[in-house]
């Protein structure tokens, strides 16, 4: 009896049960929005059903399983904001150009492209707002093309239906116990520190470059993933506020440990120094858990406190960062109030946000959306096809949502396959099942819920076309009040969806994104600026924490150039130089301060230069200024510990001058 009850309790914690629970959650959200839509006498309950499906299924498709607590609520809030922005934009466009329908449609295409451009520049988690705002305005304008005076009424109805769908999705998420991410955060914190210690062991033992590269590459990705978990934890509940602050600083400590371990490796490669036997004894011991690392760090602290001679300064810094990491990790697990020591750690640095390095990429994305919607508009106007508006809307939806993803073509293919799958599936529902349920609301809900349950399982597997099939099938089912079954209109809408997705895919493939090289060069020059900006006599500027921004750009570099290990190493060296130059004890001097400002201004000119010749000229000027600056430091009779890092930075920039400037 005990064995069977234990087996049953274990089943409720398995991934299989989580998938079934989410599929039921999706079905409940869709059925509830359908029932309330008809009960409240909404004109088109289809919009509320479609909204509930997209809000609930979108995060699951992105996560590859049941989304964590708070993800659906956050998605719903973003959709509400984007819908209101799109409605306001549509009203402004219609009021300004009500007497010129063609100009109105062209302005709508420009609006969609502009929103896509903005969505490519903002944070990924907020990009959904602007992508949605772009195609919402287009949907409203296209839907009211024949009756522009009814636009305010249509906008209000559309907002009401969308809000109803979002409320249903959030209610379903709350009722069916979404999983908390807190346990995953605690587990990731421990695993991350264990991997950090293993990287330190590799660095101190003089392992080959390939092993070091693989280790720090994996650590950068895990640290970035932990930062993403922090965002999800804050979406879950406001009670994690203190843990959120600790995780923000813990992210910085993790990046510092990566930097210190890699710098230790480079120092030992340049100047091979035998490691003290006592340190080697501690470092050679394997670690398997957070407790093991805690014991090793404690032993290292005692050894350094007893005799810090012949201990690399970077190892001392690593132990300090690991100590702060352990302190913050304990606070995250307990989620208690911040103590004095933790508050000092949190207030020690001022994190700096980096501007986007994908401005050219964003312009290409906006151009793709604008051109695609304009082509759809011309196709609609030239053919006079009744479902041309459906084609145009699908073009806007696909191009607006796909552009922010790393692989827009794959997203467009998902929508294309989804619309193709939706044709037979929708025909089965529309021609055979739904007409038989007109006398019973219960049968209608069961039929639609069964379809949603099946597609909900496929969405979590990230099956190609699953998310597109769910949205496209609901879109072509005439869930209006009262319901009508016009087969020719159904086929027109289904074919219009397919043609729209095909045209969107063609535009994405034809308008190629050739900004990859430009983005890579911009990112590398941002690392150069990050290194030289650490040269300062201003204490407030020295407290600025550029590490999260620099590693965020490094993570983008890893994604844009997945196989270019030379770029990773150069970027990591520049991050190491930033961290080393930040700790230099440069005396207060007006001449040095003026030279610091000049060096930063020249580095900014290198980043902003549009032509290769101009960029090369400014880069050569930057090298000359760094050499003169090193001479000034020597004339000030500063020790080699201050002048040598500047010379090392100048040497790195000179060695990679061609890659950074041309």
UniProtKB/Swiss-Prot annotation:
One CC-aspect GO term: plasma membrane
Membrane topology (UniProt): Multi-pass membrane protein
Chain ranges passing through the membrane: 22-42, 52-72, 76-96, 102-122, 129-149, 161-181, 378-398, 415-435, 439-459, 465-485, 491-511
UniProt record, GO biological process: carboxylic acid transport
MF GO annotations: transmembrane transporter activity
UniProtKB keywords: Cell inner membrane, Cell membrane, Membrane, Transmembrane, Transmembrane helix, Transport
Ranges in coiled-coil conformation: none
Subcellular location: Cell inner membrane
N-terminal signal peptide: none
Keyword Membrane: yes
Family (UniProt): Belongs to the aromatic acid exporter ArAE (TC 2.A.85) family.
Cited function: Forms an efflux pump with AaeA. Could function as a metabolic relief valve, allowing to eliminate certain compounds when they accumulate to high levels in the cell.
Name this polypeptide is given: p-hydroxybenzoic acid efflux pump subunit AaeB
Gene for this chain: aaeB
């Amino acid at each position: 009896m005990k064995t069977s009850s234990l087996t049953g309790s274990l089943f409720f914690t398995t991934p299989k049960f989580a998938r079934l629970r989410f599929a039921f959650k999706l079905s409940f959200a869709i059925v509830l929005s359908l029932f309330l839509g008809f009960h409240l006498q909404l004109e088109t309950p289809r919009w509320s059903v479609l909204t509930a499906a997209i809000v609930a299924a979108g995060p699951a498709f992105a996560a590859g399983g049941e989304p964590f607590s708070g993800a659906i609520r956050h998605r719903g809030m973003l959709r509400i904001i984007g819908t209101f922005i799109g409605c306001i934009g549509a009203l402004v466009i219609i009021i300004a150009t009500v007497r010129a329908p063609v100009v109105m449609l062209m302005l709508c295409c420009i609006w969609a492209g502009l929103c896509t451009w903005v969505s490519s520049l903002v944070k990924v988690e907020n990009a959904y707002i602007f992508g949605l705002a772009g195609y919402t305005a287009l949907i409203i304008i296209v839907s009211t093309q024949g009756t522009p005076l009814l636009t305010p009424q249509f906008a209000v109805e559309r907002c009401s239906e969308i809000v109803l769908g979002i409320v249903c999705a959030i209610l379903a998420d709350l009722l069916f116990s979404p999983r908390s991410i807190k346990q995953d955060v605690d587990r990731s914190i421990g695993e991350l520190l264990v991997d950090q210690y293993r990287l330190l062991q590799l660095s101190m033992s003089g392992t080959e470059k390939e092993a070091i590269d693989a280790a720090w590459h994996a650590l950068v990705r895990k640290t970035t993933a932990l930062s993403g978990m922090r965002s999800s934890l804050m979406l879950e509940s406001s009670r994690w506020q203190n843990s959120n602050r600790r995780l923000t600083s813990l992210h910085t400590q993790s990046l510092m440990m990566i930097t210190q371990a890699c710098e230790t490796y480079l120092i030992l490669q340049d100047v091979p120094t035998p490691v003290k036997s006592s340190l080697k004894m501690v470092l050679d011991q394997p670690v398997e858990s957070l407790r093991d690392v805690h014991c090793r760090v404690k032993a290292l602290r005692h050894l350094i406190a007893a005799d810090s001679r012949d201990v690399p300064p970077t190892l001392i810094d690593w132990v300090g960062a690991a100590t702060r990491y352990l302190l913050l990790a304990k606070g995250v697990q307990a989620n208690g109030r911040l103590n004095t020591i933790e508050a000092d750690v949190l207030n020690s640095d001022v994190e700096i946000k980096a501007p986007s390095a994908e401005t050219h990429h964003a312009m290409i994305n906006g151009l793709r959306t604008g051109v695609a919607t304009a082509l759809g508009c011309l196709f609609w106007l030239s053919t006079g096809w009744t479902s041309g508006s459906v084609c145009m809307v699908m073009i806007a939806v696909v191009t607006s949502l796909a552009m922010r993803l790393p692989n827009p073509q794959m997203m467009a293919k998902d929508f294309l396959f989804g619309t193709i799958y939706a044709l037979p599936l929708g025909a089965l529902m529309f021609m055979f099942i739904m007409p038989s349920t007109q006398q019973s609301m219960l049968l209608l809900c069961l039929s639609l819920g069964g379809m949603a349950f099946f597609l909900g399982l496929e969405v979590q597997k990230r099956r190609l076309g699953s998310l597109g099939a769910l949205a496209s099938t609901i879109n072509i089912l005439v869930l209006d009040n009262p319901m009508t079954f016009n087969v020719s209109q159904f086929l027109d809408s289904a074919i219009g969806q397919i043609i729209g997705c095909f045209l969107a895919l063609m535009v994405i493939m034809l308008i190629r994104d050739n900004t990859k090289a430009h983005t890579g060069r911009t990112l590398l020059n941002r690392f150069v600026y990050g290194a030289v900006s650490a040269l300062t006599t201003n204490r407030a500027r020295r407290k600025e924490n550029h590490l999260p921004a620099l590693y965020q750009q490094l993570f983008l570099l890893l994604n844009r150039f997945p196989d270019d290990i030379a770029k990773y190493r150069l970027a990591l060296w520049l991050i190491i130089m930033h961290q080393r130059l930040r700790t230099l004890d440069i005396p207060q001097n007006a001449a040095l301060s003026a030279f610091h400002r000049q060096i930063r201004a020249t580095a900014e000119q290198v980043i902003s230069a549009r032509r290769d010749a101009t960029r090369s000229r400014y880069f050569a000027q930057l090298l000359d200024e760094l050499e003169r600056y090193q001479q000034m430091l020597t004339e000030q009779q500063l020790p080699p510990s201050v002048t040598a890092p500047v010379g090392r930075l100048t040497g790195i920039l000179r060695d990679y001058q061609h890659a950074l400037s041309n």
